[in-house]
Amino acid sequence: MKPQTRNTVVRMDPDTFFYDFYNRPILSDRNTVWLCYEVKMKTNDRSRPPLVAKILEGQVHFDPEHHAEMYFLSWFRGNLLQACKSSQITWFVSWNPCLNCVAKVAEFLAEHPNVTLTVSTARIYCYWKKDWRRALRKLCQTGARVKIMNYKEFAYCWENFVYKERKPFRYWDKFSGNYRFLRCKLQEILRHLMDPGTFTYNFTNDPSVLGRHQTYLCYEAEHLHSGTWVPLHQHRGFILNEASNNLSFPEGRHAELCLLDLISFWKLDPAQTYRVTCFISWSPCFSCAQEVAEFLHENPHVNLRIFAARIYDYRPGYEEGLLRLSWAGAPISMMKYSGFSHCWDTFVDHQGRSFKPWKGLNEHSQALSGRLQAILQIMGN
């Protein structure tokens, strides 16, 4: 389907702008998504303008094909991509992108490192729902900049995308309060701290636990500078495996592979050296261990350390997978008290409370460490 494109000659009606870009945090019956965009380009084709600015209209529809973000990607690939040496894309959207659109945007940015994206949204869609909060985090993790539209950006859209008849932009009642709320809410979402109960439930290192079907993975990256590892705070957070009912991954995707996706999105400098440390609730399965090993072979500038709370032994071949990781230069160890405490301090919304170990933590850690060493020794022989 071709995008329904409206250029800046035929602008948006003022009433439409005020109705659909109204920044009240909770709104109903706003089923149209407006995407006003600008593309600043560097190109060898002098016949092309350095700045393209237009409007796309999409629907909050179950079929992602009808989303404005998908229209834009289709339009950009078909019209500008081949001619661009580099481009800076800015979106001004009435609603932030959904998880499926974020996945497509992530693929697009990974495929085209010469493209940057800034998303300024008037509102956050269903900010209380986990999937939509995760969509915002994933969008940032891909390298896109996400922000709440402020007064200057509303005024800019009014000047460039609205048929205003020389009337200045006038903000509505409670505009500033709505903006402050949404800005704080976005910061809260992107801070991405785990609930204490979620951490304790999923990271308990009792090997006999049942019902822990999800894998949680906390990660932090460092850059080697003058012989010292310097934290990269922008590359820190936690992820979990993608459910099999997700449109982007019909068969599901394990947390380890999601981490590899993230590292690729970071666009790390191959001439530098980086270290990624992950704390994971289950050790990698054989298939994930293989893919991690291949990734490290293809990206020698990235080092990986893995600390696991428990050993995942539900599928055959897990022992070989653990050995494969060791051979690939990704040493795996079992989490100890210090690791659990570090995760609590770094990745959990602990509200100032210190980490309290659960019963048997040290005993389980020692037993699992002994079992891991035995596996590596036996398989190595």
Curated annotation (Swiss-Prot):
Record text on subunit structure and interactions: Homodimer.
Locations listed in the record: Cytoplasm; Nucleus; Cytoplasm, P-body
Source organism (scientific name): Saguinus labiatus (Red-chested mustached tamarin)
Catalytic activity of the protein: a 2'-deoxycytidine in single-stranded DNA + H2O + H(+) = a 2'-deoxyuridine in single-stranded DNA + NH4(+)
Presence of keyword Oxidoreductase: no
Region (Necessary for homooligomerization): 206-333
Record protein name field: DNA dC->dU-editing enzyme APOBEC-3G
Residues reported in the UniProt entry to bind Zn(2+) 2: H254, C285, C288
InterPro entries on file: APOBEC/CMP_deaminase_Zn-bd, APOBEC_Cyt_Deaminase, CMP_dCMP_dom, Cytidine_deaminase-like
